[in-house]
């Protein structure tokens, strides 16, 4: 059972898939420590704007389960936080090249704390968010750091910037 962003209660995967929109390709999920923390993540706002249901993974094993299962009833799992949401026309084109100088400056200023700086396709009202792309997620990194720190598994740190946000527009001016 997983907490549903739209139903506001625990639901099964079968219930989630049964409610999916006809054109929805993925089972969207977001991982975090608490339902409240996940509910306030900036990375989920585009899915919420499109009235997409998000499963909230609060148990350390949940993300591993999605990674092992890969699909449920022919619907792949997709992280709302770390992957491309593939919402078609809802996403603006990659503007990283247009803002290359600003992004290079931000990355250089942050030193080794981020691997990449790019224009966000997820943010609407928030100025920035941190994502990990595909592969090791932040929740997996926390888990492995706690149980097997010698592995040194690290999530890739991608700083996504809302290029339409007043804070970025003021920075760029």
Model-identified regions with their sequence ranges:
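Conserved GHKL (Bergerat-fold) ATPase module
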Residues: 1-173
């Amino acid at each position: 059972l997983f907490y549903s962003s739209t139903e506001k209660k625990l639901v099964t995967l079968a219930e989630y898939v049964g409610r999916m929109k006809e054109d929805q390709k993925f089972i969207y999920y977001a991982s975090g420590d608490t339902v409240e923390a996940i509910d306030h993540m900036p990375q989920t706002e585009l899915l919420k704007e499109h009235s997409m249901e998000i499963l909230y993974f609060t148990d350390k094993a949940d993300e591993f389960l999605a990674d092992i299962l890969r699909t449920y009833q022919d619907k792949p799992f997709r992280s709302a936080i770390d992957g491309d949401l593939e919402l078609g026309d809802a996403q603006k084109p990659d503007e990283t090249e247009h803002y290359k100088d600003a992004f290079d400056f931000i990355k250089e200023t942050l030193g080794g704390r981020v691997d990449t700086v790019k224009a966000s396709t997820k943010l609407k009202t928030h100025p920035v968010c941190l994502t990990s792309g595909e592969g090791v997620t932040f929740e997996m990194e926390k888990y492995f750091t706690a149980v097997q720190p010698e592995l040194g598994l690290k999530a890739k740190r991608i700083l996504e910037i809302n290029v339409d946000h007043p804070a970025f527009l003021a920075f760029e001016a």
